[in-house]
C-alpha cells in the first residue's frame, strides 16, 4: 500500500529519534518488493505502508467521535535512517482506502530533507482491512487537482489499471475517473491543506461572500449589547406615553442648560393652554380618546387646570351670523359642532339673529313643493335629506295646466326681489339691501286676469302654491 505526504505541516515540535521511542528495525527485504522500475519525482516524498509486529498498541482508534476507524500512529524513517513517530493529530489512513496524506517530518521549524526515493512507512500493527501492495498507486495529477475523488472512485483505481481499453470506455460512461496520459505516483507539487487550514479557508470565503452581498443578520447573531438597546414602544399605552413625555421635557431642559440658557421649570415648557379645556371625545363617553395621556385636553375635572394667561381679545362677531351649513343649500350638519363661531339653530343666540336668517332655516327644514304649476317659484332650489311625497298629478293635467299658464300673466314674477317682493311680507323680515329697495320702489299689487280658467286652480290639481 502506498501513501504520499505533501500536505501542509501542523505547528508542533521536532520529530527526532531522541523525542520518540525507536521502533524495531523493519524486516529485511521489504524494499525489494518493487521489481518493476518506477518513475519518481525528486522533489516529492513517498511512503509505503507495512506492519510492525510485536507491538501492544490497538489496531484502530476512533478520532473526533467519527464512526470510521483510523489506523494507529505510524513511524517514518528520515534521510539519516532514524525513526520518528507521526503526531496523533495528523490525518490518518481510513480503513479500506488505498491511500492517505501525511505531513512532511519536521525537526524544529525546518522540514527534514528527504531523498527522492520512496520511504518505507511502518505501522505498529497490521490493519485487517488494508491489503498490502508491492507497488505504489498511480493516478493522474490533474484529476486530484480539479475534482476531489470519492471513496468509491479511490477503491476502483487498482481495477482500472488492469482493464483493457474497452472496459475503460464502459467505466468512463459509468462515471469513473480514468487517465489515458502518462501515469505518475500519487504526488502533487502543491502541499495539500490540513483540516484546520481547510476550515480557515472556508471561514474566510464565507466572510468575503457576506461582505460582498451583505446578507441580513438574524436576530440570534446580534450582539448582546445591541439587543439590550431594543425597547418596546407601546405608543397607545397611557403610562408609557406619559413617561416618554416627561423624559422628553427633562432632556429638553438639560439641553437648554448646557447651551447657557436658564433652566426653566418643566411646567413652563408646556403650552399655555395645555389641559385648560375638556376633551370632547372623552366627555362624550362613547369612545375612549385615542391620544390617551398625549391629549392636550383634560380628561376629567382632575386634569383640568386654570390658565394663567388672560383670555383672548373678545370677538364682537361671535355667534352673530347664521352658519352657512344651515342656510339655503346647506347640508344641515356642521363639522365644527360646538366650536363653530356661527349660530346654529340649537344655540341660544339663534333668537338674536335677523328674522330673514331664521326664515332661511325654516325653509331649509320645510318639505319642498312641486312648483310646476305654482305661481311663485323659489329662486334657489335646494335638496333635503328628508324623503318627499310625490304629488299625484297625471301627465295630461300637467300639460294642460302648463299651456293655460302661458296664456296668463300669473306664471312667474320677473321683477327683482323674488319671494320677498310681495306686499304682504313685513319689511322687518327682509334683508337690509331689500329694505332699501322697498323704501324707494314699493311693490305694486297685481290683479288676477279675468280669463283665468279652472286649470290654473290649485284645488283642481291637488297642489299648493303661493297665491
From Swiss-Prot:
It is found in: Cytoplasm. Phosphorylation on Ser-457 by par-1 promotes localization of the protein to the anterior cytoplasm of the zygote. The modification Phosphothreonine is found at residue 190. Its main location: cytoplasm. Gene3D superfamilies: Zinc finger, CCCH-type (4.10.1000.10). Disruption phenotype: RNAi-mediated knockdown in mex-5 zu199 mutant background causes a loss in plk-1 asymmetric distribution during the first embryonic cell divisions. It holds the Pfam family zf-CCCH. A zinc finger (C3H1-type) spans 273-302, 317-347. One of its GO terms (biological process) is regulation of protein localization. The keyword Magnesium does not apply. Residues 196-207 have a biased composition (Basic and acidic residues). The modification Phosphoserine is found at residue 457. Residues 1-35, 163-209, 425-451 are annotated as: Disordered. Residues 1-22, 179-195 have a biased composition (Low complexity). Keywords: Cytoplasm, Developmental protein, DNA-binding, Metal-binding, Phosphoprotein, Repeat, Zinc, Zinc-finger. Transmembrane segments: none annotated. GO terms for cellular component: cytoplasm; cytosol; P granule. GO terms for molecular function: DNA binding; mRNA 3'-UTR binding; protein domain specific binding; protein kinase binding; zinc ion binding. The keyword Plastid does not apply. Interacts (probably when phosphorylated on Thr-190) with plk-1 (via POLO box domain) and plk-2 (via POLO box domain). Functions with mex-5 to affect embryonic viability, establish soma germline asymmetry in embryos and establish plk-1, pie-1, mex-1, and pos-1 asymmetry in embryos. Also affects formation of intestinal cells. This is Zinc finger protein mex-6. It comes from Caenorhabditis elegans.
